[in-house]
Design a protein with these regions (language model features):
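Membrane-proximal envelope and lipid/glycan-remodeling enzymes
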Residues: 1-174
């Protein structure tokens, strides 16, 4: 809470507005197509939900035949293990529900932002929610990994390894 208030005061000292974070002051940024309603707008919510949860990797006619979009793709394609957050039960239900509230609030804030991330694979801003999703998954996880979990974790590992290889050691990004 203290850091949030300090940030708002800092904004006021710099820009004479508590809610001005300086993004709109970057030359040309408001001319970018993803900011056609300003930096933050409820108009962006449907697109951002699609980017975060559904946007698939791209199929191509030549190698790499399957590749993540370099500006954004669904977290469910790069890390399907996060689906285990929806498992029922919890060791500490209050903690689990509090984390879900945090994820919901953070997602709303992320979804009203015009840009889905930038040059990366997956949904860049999902990392903001991951600590809470990990707590949720830990709260409702079984004592032993199930075969389905092994598959999901293995797929997530391979997908991220493949995308990292594409981005860093191939001509895909050049």
């Amino acid at each position: 809470m203290l850091l949030g208030v300090a940030t708002l005061v800092y904004n006021y000292v710099r820009f004479h507005s508590f809610t001005d974070f300086g993004y709109a002051r970057i030359p040309g940024v408001l001319n970018e197509p993803w900011y056609n309603h300003g930096i933050f707008s409820y108009h962006y919510i449907p697109r951002q939900i699609w980017e975060m949860l559904w946007r698939p990797w791209e199929t191509r006619a030549k190698f790499p035949y399957l590749a993540p979009n370099a500006f954004s793709s669904s977290i469910l394609w790069s890390s399907p293990f996060v689906l285990f957050a929806f498992r029922s039960g919890a060791k500490d239900k209050a903690l689990k529900y509090t984390c879900w509230v945090a994820v919901f609030v953070l997602c709303i804030l992320l979804w009203i932002h015009g840009n889905s991330g930038g040059w990366q694979f997956g949904y860049r801003y999902a990392m903001i929610c991951l600590p809470f999703l990990f707590v949720i998954m830990l709260e409702s996880s079984p004592k032993k990994l199930t075969p389905l979990e092994w598959v999901a974790y293995g797929f997530s590992f391979v997908a991220n390894l493949y995308a990292t290889w594409l981005f860093h050691w191939t001509e895909y990004m050049k």
